[in-house]
Amino acid sequence: MKNNYTSLKSPIDEEDELKTGHEIDLEKGLLPEYDSEEEGALPPYSDHARVSNPPNTHRENHSSGTTDDSSPFLIKLLISFTPIVLLNALAVWYLKYKDAFFKNYGAAEWTLFGFWCLVCTLVLIILTYFYETWTKAVKVTVIFLAQCIKVTAVFLAQCVKGLFNIRREMMIIIWILWLIICCILFGCVKDGRLNFNKALICSTCTISAVLFLIVSSVCIPIWTLWRALSGMLQVLGIHGIIAVLVNGSMSLFGKHFGWRGYEIEGFVLFFTSNALFLYEMERPGVLKRMRNTTGNVIGYICGGIEDAFRRIKNAFRGANDNNNIPLGEMDVEGEV
């Protein structure tokens, strides 16, 4: 095959090459002369020279330092000895707890102690010999446990977020469970299986209110906590009114009740509190509307009574005015 290579050099450049005998590199300057008869002599800018004399690397610049990355033997031995120390510390603590640390040792105990020392020595040798293997296993285990903890934390965070999203349903479920538990307790008290005193039975509503406060602080955001607290205070106020009415009824008709007074009071207060709570959760603000409605009804009744008294007063005033009219004026009015 013919070489179709065409030189891009101008005739002037070719004449300069013939005069100098070689090309001139503008960056490196003129090439020094070398003896081609010497063995292995190569021009300093040739490709073979670059390959045979590579540039200095970071490793060569720091050739004075060590290149062995493996841990020294003493460090391996110390790290391998650490788990054995921890294991023996647990054994010593257990013997101290049982008050049997080097006390009343016989032949069997000393034989067991020697066997334990032999096992610890063999374990130390094995851990030192397989240092890289078990350290890698420990690293992998630690990374795996860290990932498990991370996944668990993310899962719990999602669960908490879900609780905030369904806080009303969760609170109703928790409250119904508490209702069932308290009903079981009341039944056990009635059957005589449990001996609760009067304070515990009467404090059932207080326990329910505390549970409501705890659940509210956990499941309700802080900006709606005030509404929950106000609702709880309203429920407790209604509790007090009902308690007064129940105590008054028991004082009047105490002989007709088969149960003791504090049992009736506990039942009434407990079921009333649960009914009001569920009603408030299903329709937020119902207690406030109930209070406003009650106030309006009372105001309407009082206004009606006031109007009735005013009309009666006006009627009496009109009658008095008619009685005070003179007889002459009455005759004039009659003629007109």
Swiss-Prot record:
Keywords recorded for this protein, A-Z: Membrane, Transmembrane, Transmembrane helix, Vacuole
Membrane-related topology note: Multi-pass membrane protein
Domain of life: Eukaryota
Protein name per Swiss-Prot or TrEMBL: Meiotic drive suppressor wtf23
Keyword Heme among UniProt keywords: no
Short name of any one Pfam family annotated for the protein: WTF
Cellular-component GO terms for this entry: cytoplasm; vacuolar membrane
Name of the gene this protein is made from: wtf23
Subcellular localization, as worded in the UniProt entry: Spore membrane; Vacuole membrane
General function of this protein: Acts as a suppressor component of the dual wtf meiotic drive system, and can suppress but not confer meiotic drive by compatible poisons. Wtf meiotic drive systems promote unequal transmission of alleles from the parental zygote to progeny spores by encoding a poison and an antidote from the same locus; the poison is trans-acting and forms toxic aggregates in all spores within an ascus, wherease the antidote is spore-specific and targets aggregates for degradation by the vacuole.
Subunit structure, interactors included: Homomer. Interacts with other proteins that exhibit high sequence similarity.
Lipid biosynthesis listed as a keyword: no
Region feature (Disordered): 1-21, 35-68
Major place of residence: membrane
Chain segments annotated as transmembrane: 73-93, 110-130, 140-160, 169-189, 206-226, 228-248, 261-281
GO biological process, one term: meiotic drive
Family to which the UniProt record says this protein belongs: Belongs to the WTF family.
Gene source species: Schizosaccharomyces kambucha
